[in-house]
Swiss-Prot record:
Gene3D superfamilies: Ribosomal RNA adenine dimethylase-like, domain 2 (1.10.8.100), Vaccinia Virus protein VP39 (3.40.50.150). Disulfide bonds: none annotated. This is Ribosomal RNA small subunit methyltransferase A. InterPro entries: KsgA/Erm, rRNA_Ade_diMease-like_C, rRNA_Ade_Mease_Trfase_CS, rRNA_Ade_methylase_Trfase_N, rRNA_adenine_dimethylase, SAM-dependent_MTases_sf. Keywords: Cytoplasm, Methyltransferase, RNA-binding, rRNA processing, S-adenosyl-L-methionine, Transferase. The lineage of its organism: Bacteria, Pseudomonadati, Verrucomicrobiota, Opitutia, Opitutales. Its EC number is 2.1.1.182. S-adenosyl-L-methionine binds at N26, L28, G53, E74, D101, N123. The keyword Methyltransferase applies. It is an enzyme of class 2 (transferase). It is found in: Cytoplasm. Belongs to the class I-like SAM-binding methyltransferase superfamily. rRNA adenine N(6)-methyltransferase family. RsmA subfamily.
Length: 277
C-alpha cells in the first residue's frame, strides 16, 4: 500500500479522488508511524482490531499483514470501493469492511463474540473524533486504543481537572482508560499535509473501567457547557431533589458549591452517577 506522498498522489489520481477536507482525509505516508501504531497497540496474530476511516488502506494493510482480523468502517464510497477491490480479495477471511458513518457504527459492526477482547487502531478523521469517541465509551470497551488525533484534541481528552481544556469528554475517557505514553506526529507524515501536528494517543482500559449512563453523560455535558458558572447553581437547576447530597461530597473533598465544573475531579463526577442510580 502507498506510503510516500508521490505514490499516494498517483493512486488518488488513478481513482479520480480528490481528498475531502470535510471528512478529514489526510492520508498517512510515513511507514515509521504505521509501525509505531502497531507497536503501541501490541497487535498480535489473531487479534480482533477495529479501524475507523481506513482510507487508502495503508494502516489496514499493516494490521492484516501482522495477522490481525480487521473490522473497518469507511464512509467514502470511492475509498470503500478501492479497499473492496484490493484488500478484501487478498484477505477474504480476515478483512471485514463496512460502508457507513463511523459515529453511527463506532465499532464497525464488530460481532458480539469479539466484544470482550478487541483493540482499536485508527488514523481517526479529525472531524468526528469527539462524537465517535463518546460513542465508543458507551461500551463495549476495547482493551487498548491507539488513535491518531489532532494534537489539540488529544490534549483535551487527557487534560487534568483545573485546566481550561478539561471537559466532559475528559471525564468520560479518563474514567474508563489510563493514558499510556504516546507519540507526537508531524504534519509532514500526511498527504495532503494538515495545518496542525497530530498525536498518537495510547489508551489502556482500566482494570475496573467506569461507564457513565446516557442520562448522566447528558447531565455532565450540559454542566460543562456552562463551565464558568458555579456548580451549586448548575445542579440546583438540573437536580433539584438530589443535588444537595452530591454537593456534600464536594465539601468533604475540600471543594464547595462555588467550584466551577472544570475544577471537579473525575472521581466526584463518577459519584454523581452512583448517587443517581
Amino acid at each position: 500500500m502507498p506510503l510516500t506522498p508521490t505514490a499516494t498522489r498517483e493512486l488518488l489520481a488513478q481513482l479520480g479522488h480528490q481528498p475531502k477536507r470535510f471528512l478529514g482525509q489526510n492520508f498517512l505516508v510515513d511507514g515509521n508511524i504505521v509501525r509505531k501504531s502497531l507497536e503501541l497497540a501490541q497487535v498480535r496474530r489473531g487479534d480482533a482490531v477495529v479501524e475507523i476511516g481506513p482510507g487508502l488502506g495503508t494502516l489496514t494493510g499493516a494490521l492484516l499483514e501482522a495477522g490481525a482480523e480487521v473490522w473497518a468502517v469507511e464512509k467514502d464510497r470511492t475509498l470503500h470501493a478501492h479497499l473492496s477491490s484490493t484488500l478484501q480479495p487478498r484477505h477474504p477471511d480476515t478483512f471485514h469492511l463496512l460502508e457507513a458513518d463511523a459515529v453511527e457504527h463506532p465499532l464497525a459492526d464488530l460481532p458480539a463474540a469479539h466484544a470482550a477482547a478487541f483493540k482499536i487502531v485508527a488514523n481517526l478523521p479529525y472531524a468526528i473524533a469527539t462524537p465517535w469517541l463518546d460513542a465508543v465509551l458507551g461500551g463495549p470497551l476495547p482493551e487498548r486504543m491507539v488513535l491518531m488525533l489532532q494534537q489539540e484534541a488529544a490534549q483535551r481528552y487527557v487534560a487534568m481537572p483545573g485546566s481550561k481544556s478539561f471537559g466532559a469528554i475528559s471525564v468520560f475517557l479518563q474514567s474508563a482508560y489510563e493514558v499510556a505514553p504516546g507519540h507526537r506526529v508531524e504534519a509532514s507524515c500526511f498527504f495532503p499535509r494538515p495545518d496542525v501536528d497530530s498525536y498518537l494517543l495510547h489508551l489502556v482500559r482500566r482494570a475496573e473501567p467506569f461507564v457513565f449512563t446516557p442520562e448522566v453523560k447528558a447531565l455532565i455535558r450540559s454542566v460543562f457547557q456552562q463551565r464558568r458558572k458555579q456548580i451549586g447553581g448548575l445542579l440546583r437547576d438540573r437536580l433539584p431533589d438530589h443535588g444537595a447530597s452530591w454537593l456534600a461530597r464536594l465539601t468533604a473533598a475540600g471543594l464547595s458549591s462555588l467550584t466551577r465544573p472544570e475544577a471537579i475531579p473525575t472521581e466526584l463526577w463518577r459519584a454523581l452517577q452512583v448517587r443517581e442510580s
